[in-house]
Amino acid sequence: MESVPDLQNTMYAAVDGYPCVRLLNLSGSIGCSNPGRDKVVAPIVRFENVDKLAEPSAILVISDDSSIASKVGGVLVEPRIDLQNNLKGFSPDQKFPQAQFAPYYNTSYEWNPIGSGIMWKSYGFPVFLLTESGSKTLQEFVAKNEDKKKAYTSKVAEFDLVMQTVKSGTHDSESCLKEATCLPLGGYSVWSSLPPINISSLQQPKPILLTVASMDSASFFRDKSLGADSPISGLIALLAAVDALSYVDGLGDLSKQLVFAVFTGEAWGYLGSRRFLEELDMHSDAVRGLNHTLIETVIEIGSVGKGLSQGVKNFFAHTEGDSSATNQTLVALKRAQESLPSENIKIASASASNPGIPPSSLMTFLEKNPSISGLVLEDFDSAFVNKFYHSHLDDLCELVHAVGIIFFFLLDLSFYMINAANVNSSAVVAAASLIARTLYMLASEIEDVQDSTLASINVNASLVKQLMGCLLDCDPGLSCELVKKYISPMSSCPSHYVGVILDEPSSTPFTGYINDVPRFIWNFLSDRTSIPRENNISGCQQGCKGRDEVCIKAEADGKGVCVLSTTRYVPAYSTRLKFESGVWNVLPPNSSDKMGVADPIWTESNWNSIGIRVYTVQNASYDRLVLLGGITLTIFAYLAIATARAILSKAMKRD
């Protein structure tokens, strides 16, 4: 050892994990945090019996005993691949996610029957999901601790999950925003038109066919939110459909304008779609070229990754709104299915017994305009088939891959086994093909589009597999060639948590404030929907000259390319928030805006650092024993000295 850092590395071992963090709304908080201003230090034990816990401990637990909660110092959730029991799934969300925003009254309906709702509760102790390497480190410490039960040392875990809102005593969104101890959940959505919209044209603007998908998911653990089936399979299908349509000639001659939007923040009160409509009302630069009165039909691509069953790709059309336009969409969807005979696709209308459309961005548009025509394409009918909705387990897993999760939630242990991949690429390809051909038929307004024309609209299956590898896995993850063609990712492992909005919202935000995924989507859509500029050799270091031009691939090669594209970022944050003089202010609710009244206004607590480390400490009982021994020894020494002095004094007097 040559330095203090070397000594620290010898004494302490960092443990990798994904934290559950503190989120706040207008009425309180959810999520996890250290209970006070200090780090939590607790011995690591593998729980067997609550009566054996004599002090707050960091536990590796297999239990359903809620009485343990009062003795918990912290929770370590251990991923396992060796437990293969009968499983029913796991979803920490509600049985009707975001029911308060539904455009109908039956909010007791269970779209997500397996939902436990645990992610919407507040916990006064830290909780971490360990990575595989973190689990290995911790298991070694646990094994050593159990092997040395008679030793006077123990292994402890130190949780650094101190939230600024807990330290400052700001326990709701309004107070923490005033004290600057939190930031609003949000980010940037992306929209693009195909072909680009000529804003300076004097011609009558075309009706708009708006196709939407979501790019954000949620889970109990902040940075483990892949959302493979829900909703990223729909996002991938949308990107693949845009790619397929970009090769079709004559799109500018169609009767309707194709517009695509990818929203973020939908898992937290439909932040992206609500702000998108708000920006349309304000005619802001972020939506320049669009007019909400021209939006004729909204088609949403929801969860489509689990549509494959026994070789058949099954999808369900959930519809709402104007019957004639909706019927046209259903007819086009059916025709698209018939044009793909070799794909073995089945389309069915959702059950009439459903209370309405499932949780989706379309709810926002219906609240704004109840007469708008809308359709949501899903891989389920009356209830989610994704058994891991808004769970860290909704990932891209291999076929016949078993997963056992030791997860206690005051305290609920669930084991899960996945018998098939969460997302099937052929199902995503089928959904993308249906959407691409349906959009072409609706935009052309030709009753009998030639089969040869539809046959020319083909989805690139290799692109779908690429996107799945890039957006749903860490290997290659965002380090894949497709993503690196456009941006320089900050991390290779994708996470689809919405994050927080860091500065004043803008239609031209600083790219450092935008997450990797929306930056990639913006570049991808700009590229696929663009018209290249002639003689574009010099790049765009000095900016693009044309008003409707954008610079793509600048992060990747430092030069970039100017292209003509109507692709924009749109801020995504609560419509009840306003940024003024560097401060976020909460606006009073508008009684005419049902969704605004229901908006919880989600914020995320600030923190200085988050982490876990483990190390060895000497037991307090041993310290007390040493102290007692020292005191006893001192007393005996004193008595011995006093006795010796007395004896010596008597002896000297006799002399």
Protein language model features and the residues they cover:
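Secretory-pathway/membrane protein signature
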Residues: 1-655
